[in-house]
Structures are given as C-alpha cells and as structure tokens.
Amino acid sequence: MNDSEFHRLADALWLTIEERLDNWDGDSDIDCEINGGVLTISFENGSKIIINRQEPLHQVWLATKQGGYHFDLKGDEWICDRSGETFWDLLEQAATQQAGEKVSFR
C-alpha cells in the first residue's frame, strides 16, 4: 500500500464513522470532530475516543479509556496488531462503554 492509498482508506474510515454518528439516535449525546488526521469522538460524560493515522506505518491508532490499539489493513479489514480483533469491534466496545448504551458503527 502506498501513502495515497492509505489516506484514501483512512478517509473512508473517518467518513463512515462520521456518517454513523450523524445518524445516531440514542439517548447519549455523542459528537465527532475531525481535525487534520485526527478524529475525536466526545461523549456526554466528558470522555473521548481518539482515532488517528500513523502514515509512516500505514496504521490507524485508536485511543480509548480501555487502552490504545494499533491497526493494520489485512484484506479489507483493519485488524489490531496485538489482539487480532477488528477495528469496528473494538470501537463499538469502547463507544458502548463510554456512552453507557449500545453504539453500533455497522
């Protein structure tokens, strides 16, 4: 994967997250902000999830209250380099915990 393809894929990931949160109809107030290569999800309780790009490594990094995760693209899925879990699974787990209700991105 070259840098241009990495940015295209990361942009698509950011757009999907933003669209899902724009359509969020849960009770919790969840906001999403993109600034440069960083996407910040903010919750009512003041907690945040930070997602950023690591261009030199062609990785997406996810920072949550539960910890930090690094994802490599394998096939068409972003996979955690430690646990083997998908980006979407870990993001949903963290967002659900931080929102206090089920949050789905798929």
From Swiss-Prot:
One of its GO terms (molecular function) is ferrous iron binding. GO terms for biological process: iron-sulfur cluster assembly. The keyword Iron applies. GO terms for cellular component: cytosol. Keywords: Iron, Metal-binding. Pfam families: Frataxin_Cyay. Involved in iron-sulfur (Fe-S) cluster assembly. May act as a regulator of Fe-S biogenesis. Belongs to the frataxin family. NCBIfam families: FeS_CyaY. This is Iron-sulfur cluster assembly protein CyaY.
